[in-house]
Each structure stands twice: as structure tokens, then as C-alpha cells.
């Protein structure tokens, strides 16, 4: 099976492919070293090769490697930042760089695997997911009843999810709603774009509020009104304020680092499935994100909870 991808931002080849293919960098390194990757028709065997905007990256996978097999979640001994836990649910602050759910190449290195290890191999289920390089609040259920209850809240918009996004350039409007349907980019299995009202496009809505901005950048609050793949990242690119360091949807002139996009799931609120009371939790930014805000002189309060009401 062969796939070809277009580069939009300058970055390392292994970082680019790890994001697109949702693989660990160890697995991507093996693909590159084994000679399965070429750039603009030239075989590349160096992981740190820098790809540039408009480069064409071709991956030639073996059929055996692409054989579809069920993915079994393997327990992963990884320290979790648990914000809340009881017999029904877990609320966790997911770190940047950790996938939510295992793929066929990452059976053990996932947040779900870490939760399974923490729960002594007792069943645990993801209520929703976050992209690998998106940090922040993620919720898990410990039984099917709680899972269905919480997923229904997602569908009916009872559950509220708020994100912090660091974007390029100041915004003219300090608040608003982005209404733009999303569809896949051709046959690309990873990237999405704003489409039209065809059958392929899915309605998507994102509310935003500017928290702080200057002549270079803005820190904005985003609320998901729908939950499409890469929704916030594509919507912000669409209004010409792409997320900083986004390897898929960022500025072409920006060389993305391994940290990935500066996007953080800051807060979640929901009705507890058995206690029947409203609960809310907030996840703190990691040091890399906080330092980036300091470097851009975008100060924020120690706690943003009041901003997410």
C-alpha cells in the first residue's frame, strides 16, 4: 500500500510522519531506515531530514504491515495525572505526545493502556479522544452504563468542553462562532479541510473568545459545539489564525517542533452518571505551553476556571 502526503510546514521528516500516521517515532524511524520513505522521489534514510513546504513525501508500506487486525489494548505502566476518580469515571490530564487509543503499532503506549494498568486490568473506556499532541482533560468510564450515559451527554451537548489555543496574529473579532462543514482532504486518511454542503462534509461549529492578544499572537478559548476530527485546528486555519506549531494545519513558514500544536483541553463539565450532579474539572497547562505564552508576552491567570463559565 502506498501513500503520498504534501508538506505544509517545515519540520523533521520523522515528526511529520509520526503525526500523519499516528505512529510512535520509533516505528516511524524503522520505516525511514528500512528505505520505505522518499521525499520528492528521493529515498531518505535519515530520521532528522528536514522537509519543506510543498515537498511530496511518499511512503511505500508492505501489505503485511497494513494487514488489518483487531487492536488489543495493552496495559501501559505510565504515571497518570488523575484529576478525579470514583467507581464510575476517571478524569485525567493527558500529556502532550501520548495517543488516546492504541493503534496497531502502539498497542501499549496509550492513555487507555495507562488507565487499564491503573485500574488493575479492570474494564475502562474512553468517552472521547484527544489528538496525540493535544494535552488536557480527557474522560474515561469504568463500565458500559456510565459510558453510554456520558456519550449521550456529548451528543446532546450537555457535556461542555473548552480548549485553550495559541494562534498566530491578533483577531479582529473578540468572540464569535465558526460555522464551517468539514470533510477529508481527498483520499488522505488523516487531514481534514473546510468543505461545502455536499454529502461528504459534516457540519461543525466552534465558539471562540479572545482571552489575550498582541501584535504577534492570540490566546483564545474555544468551545466545541460539535466534535469533528481536528475541528478546532481546521476551523482556526480556515479563519487565517492557525494554531502555533501545528504540523498539519500551521503556517507554511513555521518549522514545527516535536511538541506539536499548542492546543490544550482546559476544562470539562458534565452530569455525573450515577450521582446526577454537575461536575467540572480543569487541567493546568504544561511547562512548554506556559513558557511559550511567557515568551510571547501573553499572560494568563493562575486559574482560568472563571473564564470557562
From Swiss-Prot:
Organism field: Mycoplasma pneumoniae (strain ATCC 29342 / M129 / Subtype 1) (Mycoplasmoides pneumoniae)
Protein name: Uncharacterized RNA pseudouridine synthase MG209 homolog
Domain S4 RNA-binding, chain residue ranges per copy: 11-87
Family: Belongs to the pseudouridine synthase RluA family.
Top-rank taxon, per record: Bacteria
CDD domains reported in the protein's UniProt record: PseudoU_synth_RluA_like, S4
GO molecular function, one term: RNA binding
PANTHER family: MITOCHONDRIAL RNA PSEUDOURIDINE SYNTHASE (PTHR21600), RIBOSOMAL LARGE SUBUNIT PSEUDOURIDINE SYNTHASE D (PTHR21600:SF44)
Catalysis: reaction(s): a uridine in RNA = a pseudouridine in RNA
